[in-house]
Amino acid sequence: MSNRKYFGTDGIRGKVGDSPITPDFVLKLGWAAGKVLARHGSRKIIIGKDTRISGYMLESSLEAGLAAAGLSASFTGPMPTPAVAYLTRTFRAEAGIVISASHNPYYDNGIKFFSIDGTKLPDDVEEAIEAEMEKPLTCVESAELGRANRIVDAAGRYIEFCKGTFPSEQSLNGLKIVLDCANGATYHIAPNVLRELGADVVTIGCEPNGININEKCGATDVRLLQQRVVEEKADVGLAFDGDGDRVIMVDHLGQKVDGDQILYIIAREALRQGQLRGGVVGTLMSNMGLELALKQLGIPFLRAKVGDRYVLEKLQEEGWRLGAENSGHVILLDKTTTGDGIVAGLQILSAMVRNHMSLHDLCSGMKLLPQVLVNVRFSGSHDPLKSENVINITKSVETELNGRGRVLLRKSGTEPLIRVMVEGEDDVQVTALAHRIADAVKHAG
């Protein structure tokens, strides 16, 4: 992928008030996107957002920029990212825009785009938008200005879509489910989906106030969910992130079930139902235990770079339909065009109903190897990964693992972080080794 000035692996993201997440930049971005997208014919753009307080400001800026370029905006209000992808397709809009920083704190926000078919914008379109950003802003003639409206039934449309991905001959009657919606975009969607399918639903993280999104809740912090599942004697728990494109689950014992385990269960079920096309795609961060478990089932497995867009690219290259990240992004191309936490969770619930098995038992065919991830924040222009000391210590750790584990160092695509991952057979050892490398990264440069 070429070096781009603004777009990262998941759109444009940053701290609100700091460049580039400022009202003037986002207005210019809306205008530039409008200029590029208007060339393709349709003049309607769907705009959704999560529950961050800054969403109001940024959607107004986007609307102004798009209108100046002659495009109209249709607002969904707070809506999961995959819902915007779905609505973009069903409304035949030229593009969808999501205002969200996903799992980040409330003071961050971001802008990401979907194309007319509900997939991430191609690199060349993002590059064209960046090129347009360098030009002076102009305004179309008054008669050609864009308009704005709200899609009043957006939530209901998406709820019905989600329910449609669950087998019609099944129901969730008799299942008690705890939902953690991260005080984010799924707060008014997921509880209704599961209740309408018959579940007894207990909710947490469903009271967004603009600043509590992802705060000690949701897919990135399931401790409260684990506690509530056990307290409520629930069958299962589901946690979504702030924009609803990922899911992490908790079994009836309070044990966390991550994206690798979710991918394993869905792949095994698809194989048993004769619905698995080819193999499945994970990432460089996927646990070795997933690879080994899939190998036992005879299911081909490939690793993509980290990022759901790269999982999707690999699936398209191979002509396969199923992929996931261990963070909980699950892509089911037979049902959706992008990661969808609610839809992925429904497939696991369906497997529980079909097999009359608990989530804990469904996971029993796969053993996760100990894996430790340490995030190290860095600043400045130096690249810690090029430090001679970091390189040497990483090599010594690989020697110590002696072929019975993995080491991965990579830059985050959305934050100024170096992610240090060490995987092996012994939990204590991999923890110590990961922190040894992290200390070297911290002091590099």
Swiss-Prot record:
Posttranslational modification: Activated by phosphorylation.
Enzyme class: isomerase
E.C. numbers: 5.4.2.10
One Gene Ontology term, aspect cellular component: cytosol
Active-site positions on this chain: S102
Chain sites annotated for binding Mg(2+): S102, D241, D243, D245
CDD domains linked: GlmM
Reactions listed under catalytic activity: alpha-D-glucosamine 1-phosphate = D-glucosamine 6-phosphate
GO molecular function list: magnesium ion binding; phosphoglucosamine mutase activity; phosphomannomutase activity
Gene3D superfamilies per the UniProt record, alphabetical: Alpha-D-Glucose-1,6-Bisphosphate, subunit A, domain 3 (3.40.120.10), Alpha-D-phosphohexomutase, C-terminal domain (3.30.310.50)
Keywords: Isomerase, Magnesium, Metal-binding, Phosphoprotein
Entry-annotated residues carrying Phosphoserine: S102
Entry cofactors: Mg(2+)
SUPFAM superfamilies: Phosphoglucomutase, C-terminal domain (SSF55957), Phosphoglucomutase, first 3 domains (SSF53738)
GO biological process, one term: peptidoglycan biosynthetic process
Free-text function comment from the UniProt entry: Catalyzes the conversion of glucosamine-6-phosphate to glucosamine-1-phosphate.
Family the UniProt entry places it in: Belongs to the phosphohexose mutase family.
This protein's name: Phosphoglucosamine mutase
Species the sequence originates in: Photorhabdus laumondii subsp. laumondii (strain DSM 15139 / CIP 105565 / TT01) (Photorhabdus luminescens subsp. laumondii)
